């Protein structure tokens, strides 16, 4: 594709680049905020799991999560494997947080 077909001039291209990067920075902030919010729920989740005598790892819940991610990947036309890898990291973060809380509770430090 010819460069001239995309933009009127370099000013327009630079402006779009700048604005797009600013928007990505905002989105990155929102993503990190939501991951933090999700991780903070680990305390409530582990307390409920302790009360219900459940393990930290819940195979059925993770299946639901990954089924939703797979469907969303298709709906949003995003590589499913990449989204699943991202969710693996996010769920690991939550499980690690739950394990840490459980360890502190057992040691009487929470």
Could you say what each language-model-derived stretch is?
Residues 1-110:
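Domain-level signature for soluble enzymes in the chorismate/prephenate branch of the shikimate pathway
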